[in-house]
């Protein structure tokens, strides 16, 4: 997949089949759009183009909001889009000035004139232009005028739950990791660097890798204990992670840590990715470290049993 950072980098491609969006979750609904684009591109001997924005429009339009968190980092989003077989990714810098672009200008001057759109595929809730003023009806009118095709993908649902990034974010905030993973179509993950902790886990036989995130806008799933898969370089492991404040040792800062099963390597300053599979329990304050140790033994048994049943 070729990535273009700005319209000035983009070179027109043959019969471009295009979609536009922020694609925070890159979820199953988005995958349906990408699949349709690929099929259309094959039928017209064209190429697929995803148009997205950086930074996320909400960060520009609502710069003072303290609760803006996103499911995927920019790097993870791009990687997922590539995995779905897209040919070209055009990243348009989203500025205050660009946020004032009206719907007609966006379609005619950008999608039509600069990209040379042949066909456009959008989701059921797609709006475009300043203040999301452009509706699908307006899009169809512009498509007729400029002579390109437009298609809207209906809402996708699983178990009668309509798939949307908002629903996924809410599921993560509530700790409903299985629901979030189902709607995403893959396991929610956190990537970060391993930093030094207070080594209390090591003292009680459960050494942990403490993770420091490199993206302040990354959405962290709810506090609790989780069954996890861990990727370090090209190696994969099973383990159990904790997100919380470690109340048993009176820690006041939110920490992300993972105990990796059958693992005894020094990985300080290394980058690892934690994939969250299931939420095991709430974080609890125990009377002492011995009580915590006994509970961790039970947690490990629960997690291993869960993985063995997969």
Where are these predicted regions, by residue range?
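A short acidic, often aromatic-flanked loop/helix-cap motif at beta-alpha or helix-coil junctions
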Residues: 9-12, 96-99, 157-162
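Short acidic-hydrophobic, aromatic-tinged amphipathic segments that line or gate anion-handling sites
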Residues: 2-8, 90
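N-terminal catalytic cores of NTP/NDP-binding nucleotidyl/phosphoryl-transfer enzymes
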Residues: 7-69, 73
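Glycine-rich, Lys/Arg-enriched anion-binding loops that position phosphate/diphosphate groups
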Residues: 143-240
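N-terminal Rossmann-like or analogous alpha/beta NTP/dinucleotide-binding catalytic cores
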Residues: 59-124, 128-146
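Phosphate/ribose-recognition catalytic cores of enzymes acting on nucleotide-derived substrates
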Residues: 197-310
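Residue-level signal for inorganic ion chemistry
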Residues: 27, 81, 120, 180, ...
């Amino acid at each position: 997949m070729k990535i273009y950072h700005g319209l000035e980098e983009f070179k027109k491609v043959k019969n471009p089949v295009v979609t536009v969006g922020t694609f925070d979750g890159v979820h199953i609904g988005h995958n349906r759009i990408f699949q349709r684009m690929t099929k259309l591109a094959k039928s017209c001997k064209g190429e697929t183009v995803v148009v997205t924005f950086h930074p996320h429009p909400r960060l520009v339009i609502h710069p003072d909001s303290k609760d803006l968190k996103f499911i995927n980092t920019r790097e993870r989003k791009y990687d997922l889009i590539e995995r779905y077989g897209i040919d070209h990714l055009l990243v348009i810098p989203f500025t205050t000035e660009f946020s004032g672009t009206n719907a007609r200008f966006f379609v005619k001057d950008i999608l039509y004139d600069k990209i040379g759109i042949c066909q456009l595929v959008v989701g059921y809730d797609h709006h475009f232009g300043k203040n999301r003023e452009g509706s699908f009806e307006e899009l169809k009118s512009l498509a007729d005028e400029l002579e390109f095709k437009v298609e809207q993908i209906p809402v996708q649902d699983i178990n009668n739950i309509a798939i949307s990034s908002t629903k996924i974010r809410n599921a993560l905030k509530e700790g409903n990791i299985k629901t979030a993973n189902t709607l995403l179509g893959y396991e929610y993950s956190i990537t970060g660097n391993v930093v030094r902790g207070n080594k209390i886990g090591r003292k009680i036989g459960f050494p942990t890798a403490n993770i420091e995130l490199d993206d302040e806008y990354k959405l962290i799933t709810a506090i609790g204990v989780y069954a996890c898969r861990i990727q370090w370089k090209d190696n994969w492991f099973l383990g159990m992670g904790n997100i919380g404040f470690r109340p048993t040792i009176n820690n006041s800062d939110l920490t992300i840590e993972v105990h990796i099963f059958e693992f005894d390597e020094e990985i300080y300053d290394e980058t690892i990715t934690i994939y969250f599979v299931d939420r095991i329990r709430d974080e609890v304050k125990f009377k002492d470290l011995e009580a915590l140790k006994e509970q961790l033994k039970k947690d490990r048994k629960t997690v291993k049993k869960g993985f063995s049943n997969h």
